[in-house]
Amino acid sequence: MSNYLRKKYNQEFVVEEPSLSAAGLGVEGTWGVDAHPVSSKDTTFRIIKVENRNSFSDQYTAKIWSQRETARLNKIAQQNVANSKWNVKVSVEIYLVEPLADTALPDNPKVEEIIRQDYGPVYNVNLSYFELQNTSYDDIVCDMERIANSITNNSIKMSIITIL
C-alpha cells in the first residue's frame, strides 16, 4: 500500500497496520488501512483493497478537498458572526466513489467541476452552533440558509447536518 501511494502521489506516507473485514467462507473481504503523509498527521485517510482485486482505492484526494472546503466555508460562516450572539463551526466531508477515487488528484484545477458532477463525490456539510443563549432560532435558520446558498450557488450537490 505504501508503494501504491508513493507512485500515485509522489510523496511518502505512513501506513498503519491493515485489517481484513467482512471475510468468510465464500465471501470476499476488504482490506482497509489508515494512512497519512509523513509531513501531515492531520491528514489521515482510508485505503481499501477488495480481496482478489489487483487495485487499491483511497480517499487522500477527498481528505485534501474536505480540508480546503472546510476552510473556505468557515470563512463564509464567520462573515456575520461578529454581529451575532452565536458561534458556528463548519466541517465538510467529501467521499469519492470510483472512478473518481482512482483518478482525481488533490491539485486538480477543476475541483469544483468534479464536485458538481452527477456521479461525483458525496459532499456532507456539518454546521455546529454554539453559545445560543438569547438567540432566535429564526436568526440561526437564516444563517444556515446563507451558508447553504453559498454552496448551492456553485451548483454543488450536498447534504447539510446542523447541530444546535
Predicted ranges, named:
Residues 12-49:
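Exposed beta-strand-loop-beta-strand "reactive/processing" segments of non-cytosolic proteins
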Residues 60, 64, 68, 135-142:
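Alpha-helix boundary/N-cap detector
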Residues 1-17, 69-82, 144-145:
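Short, non-transmembrane alpha-helical segments in secretory-pathway proteins
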